[in-house]
């Protein structure tokens, strides 16, 4: 008994130092199970290790089985109320998955580690919805085209499938300044919400034709990248203040204090390419700079594309010009449906420096409702070799990178 007491009375600082030498989530869980005191002292999610995990949604209808792959280890996480065929993954941030429930239009945040969920405002509350009639089967939505103001009708299932391109969150939902931002519509517009908001609010831009491909939260700003690789910056605090006004605005006002297009023009090299065949991602770095990752795609067969190559550009803090990068040095990046992030692998055996971890985020392909191949892998920038991940497996719900 005295031996057990010595373990349970271990100082929290020393216990935390032990966790710093654990790179496997499996080992971390086993450490928490040593005794009740350790289980209560250690959080359910390790907050010091950020290894990229690949979430592989199961394919069965009535058992919502997810597999988290960490090198050779696979962890099984059960969500009793999660139907793979009725959910679209549209984001992964801070250990949370963001999904759209096709049948009802709910937008749900799921935590695979704690098995908790939180709802964001539903799809029916997006700014392009004029009216929603849930009882009008096949004609539930009256919508407005934000580009030319044309009014049209659409059935609920189609709208729920195609409305959301991607959602990222600023922090875990228990933070007071929590905010979510969505890229929505085929034309790639931005909308935001706070926790407990009833609806989404549009963020306007001076350029009506702007088509955003990626968005992140970084240093109290929202950065968004459009299909022409133009960078936009918005002030998160100013937007939060606008959302807190009474009555609640239908859209964030087009104010200079909100932000807009940055002065840094797109990299000249990219003007040579047909930009629609690219996926663009923006990433915040620990030194305050921004990275732009451009993924070039080749169409291998009908409704399937594969990565051809990557271009990496860097925008230093206070700079107005992107510079070409040939190395990520001691860092790695992770892109896809997840919030685009930079990682420091350190000595971790599960994450390698100077590598790009990528998954597919082709929204149109993923809303067809049938299994399909996914373009995902790990690229070594040093020798440009790519390790494809499960290239011959078809998925109903696309795999997604996840950071605890």
Where are these regions (language model features)?
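Inter-blade boundary loops/turns of WD-repeat beta-propellers
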Residues: 43, 70, 112, 195, ...
């Amino acid at each position: 008994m005295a031996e057990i007491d010595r373990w349970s009375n271990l100082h929290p600082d020393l216990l935390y130092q032990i966790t710093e030498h654990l790179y496997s989530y499996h080992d971390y869980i086993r450490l928490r199970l040593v005794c009740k005191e350790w289980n209560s002292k250690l959080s359910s999610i390790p907050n010091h290790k950020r290894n990229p995990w690949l979430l592989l949604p199961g394919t069965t209808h009535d058992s919502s089985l997810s597999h988290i792959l960490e090198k050779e280890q696979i962890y099984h996480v059960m969500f009793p109320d999660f139907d793979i065929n009725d959910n679209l993954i549209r984001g992964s941030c801070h250990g949370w998955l963001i999904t759209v429930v096709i049948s009802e239009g709910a937008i749900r945040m799921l935590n695979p580690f704690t098995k908790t969920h939180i709802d964001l405002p539903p799809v029916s509350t997006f700014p392009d919805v004029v009216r929603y009639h849930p009882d009008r089967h096949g004609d539930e939505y009256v919508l407005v085209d934000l580009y030319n103001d044309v009014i049209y009708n659409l059935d609920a299932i189609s709208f729920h499938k195609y409305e959301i391109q991607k959602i990222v969150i600023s922090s875990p939902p228990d933070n007071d300044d929590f905010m979510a931002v969505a890229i929505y519509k085929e034309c790639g517009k931005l909308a935001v919400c706070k926790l407990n908001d009833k609806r989404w609010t549009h963020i306007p831009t001076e350029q009506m034709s702007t088509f955003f491909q990626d968005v992140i939260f970084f240093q109290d700003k929202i950065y968004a990248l459009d299909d022409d690789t133009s960078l936009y910056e918005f002030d998160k605090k100013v937007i939060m203040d606008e959302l807190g006004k009474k009555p609640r605005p239908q859209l964030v006002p087009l104010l200079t204090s909100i932000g807009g297009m940055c002065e840094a023009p797109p990299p000249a090299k990219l003007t040579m390419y047909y930009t629609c065949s690219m996926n663009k991602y923006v990433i915040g770095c620990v030194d305050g700079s921004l990275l732009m990752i451009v993924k070039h795609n080749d169409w291998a067969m009908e409704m399937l594309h594969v990565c051809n190559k990557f271009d990496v550009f860097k925008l230093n803090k206070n700079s107005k010009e992107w510079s070409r990068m040939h190395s990520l040095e001691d860092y790695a990046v992770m892109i896809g449906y997840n919030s685009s992030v930079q990682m420091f692998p350190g000595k971790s055996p599960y994450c390698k420096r100077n590598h790009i971890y990528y998954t597919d985020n082709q929204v149109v392909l993923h809303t067809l409702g049938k299994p399909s191949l996914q373009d995902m892998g790990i690229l070594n920038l040093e020798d440009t070799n790519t390790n494809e991940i499960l290239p011959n497996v078809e998925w109903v719900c696309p795999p997604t990178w996840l950071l605890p």
